[in-house]
Amino acid sequence: MTKKTILITGCSSGIGYTCAHALHKQNYQVITSCRNKKDVERLQSEGLTCIERDLTDKTSISLAVAETMRLCQGNLYALFNNGAYGQTGALEDLPVDALKEQFETNVFGWHQLVCEVLPYMRKQGQGRIIQNSSVLGFAAMKYRGAYNSSKFALEGWTDTLRLEL
């Protein structure tokens, strides 16, 4: 039986890291991805397949998808979007560029990644997209405005995608 392949973003620590190891132990072909080369090397040394990918870089995303599809021979069972980061501080003190950076990682990068894997999933007639957002996409917290906003946007985007698929 062929192993099911799952691509997980944001695996350098936390939920992505833990899920990657747990799914690997359950005999999934896990392809992890991280932004930093040192994290990629660390995960590889732990026995996981890991590729470098930066959600703020369109070329990096495209290369990561191409490498993922090569590794799984075009048969991707699931995409687990988890990679994100959060800025703290009052909204009135937040420069527009900082807000744009937050959305580049937490919304636009996820959008591009999903748009690039969907054709493969459609071709194979199946696929799953798991979006690990945050409770802060439903209930705001002060001094987390940039993160809150990106997660609220992601929740709306994900609900719309679900309806369209």
Regions flagged by a language model, labelled:
Residues 134:
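Residue(s) in the substrate-gating loop at a strand-loop-helix junction
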Residues 12-13:
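Conserved glycine-rich cofactor-binding loop
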Residues 90-91, 98-100:
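Substrate-binding pocket helix/loop in short-chain dehydrogenase/reductase
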Residues 53-63, 96:
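The beta1-alpha1 cofactor-binding region of Rossmann-like NAD(H)/NADP(H)-dependent oxidoreductases
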Residues 82-87:
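Conserved NAD(P)H cofactor-binding loop of Rossmann-fold oxidoreductase domains
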Residues 92, 139-145:
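Active-site loop immediately N-terminal to the catalytic Tyr-X3-Lys motif
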Residues 114, 150:
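Active-site helix of classical SDR
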